[in-house]
Amino acid sequence: MASLSGPISPTNLEMFKPGVEELNPSKLLLLSNHQEGMLYPTILGSLELLSFKRERSLNLLRDKVCLLHQESQLLKLRGTGTDTTDVLLKHAMATSVNCCHDGIFTILEQDRMPKTSMAPTLTESSGSLVTRLMSIPRLTFSIGTQVAMRLFRLGFRLARYSLRVTILKAQEGLLLIPDLLHAHPVEPLVQDRVVEPILAIEPLPLV
């Protein structure tokens, strides 16, 4: 901000009076903005505060114009079925450059945002994936059987009773599978599978 040099004369004091009707053009300093070629007046004296308020209100008006312009772009892109995130980000940066001629930019360069796909990616073919999914119950049952046999050998009565009830219910479900498939049709994947014969399991001891 420029300052007055030399002794203060009565002529200079007239600038600080509130009843100034006309501003002398010789007392204005024109600062050029090299980016946009715009001129901003820097007023000497107490009228500098009024000029600052006027420029600030102008900047707020520009911000409102930018926001309305972005909202209109969002309404145009609504319902098109495309991802509007990158479009709005690029448009917001371009609009801020056009609107904020004399602003201070805190973000010099926008980093590229990594695009993540929410859809699951299958690295296996459908046949091998189905085979792997079908082998999961067998592995689970085999592990459960081994754990049950260990608990029976250790002699925990309550654990043995609970496991016996669970195993009996599982055997009952296996016996009812053929009848349930005919009564309640399910997915073709299950219908095409041949029900394996159930091997006779020796009765488990209660004690």
Curated annotation (Swiss-Prot):
Does the record bear DNA repair in its keywords?
Answer: no
GO CC annotations on file? virion component
Where is this chain primarily localised? virion
A Pfam family this chain is assigned to: Corona_I
Additional facts recorded: The gene encoding this protein is included within the N gene (alternative ORF).
Its biological purpose is as follows: Structural protein that is not essential for the viral replication either in tissue culture or in its natural host.
Subcellular compartments: Virion
Q: Which InterPro entries match?
A: Corona_nucI, N2-like_embe-CoV
Protein name (Swiss-Prot/TrEMBL): Protein I
Q: Does the keyword Electron transport apply?
A: no
Which family does the record assign? Belongs to the coronavirus I protein family.
Swiss-Prot/TrEMBL keywords: Virion
